[in-house]
Amino acid sequence: RYDLRLCAQALKKLKDAGYKLIVVTNQAGVARGYYTEDDVKNLHQYMNQVLQKDGAWIDAFYYCPHHPVHGIGIYKKECNCRKPGTGMFEMAEKDFPVDKAASYMIGDKLLDTEAGQRFGVASILVGTGYGAELHKEAQEKDEKPPYDHYADTLEEAAQWILEKKWKIKTK
């Protein structure tokens, strides 16, 4: 099982380095009727409460409640907000100044990394969740994977980002 305290510590390091932390998440469970948008918002609020115990927090959450095939009612639709679309990134960009050259998308699915690349930010696939298997499959193919870097954990991804930032500052 993944240690969420390590996750909070990694996020805190990024916050301490001046990064804004933005979550963009597909929530097809809303479209499928498994849970409500209020449930998603409550979960995000709870996540921040847990993270704040370790000095970290998420600056903003953006979610897509739609699904093009399995949705119910207003939630069954094609949209640009669902990753790999860039709609949630564009919403975040309206709320926060984004320096794309110094921004990163971290995710455990190729939809995440593809969305980041489409938006013009570097993408990191992490090995937690689905990432390790996807990375293994990508290595077996003789083509460039749809991500810029692979890290086994969020801690490794954060360290890579911080090292890259340090290198840029010292040039």
Where do the PLM segments sit?
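Short, charge-patterned binding micro-sites
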Residues: 25-32, 64-70
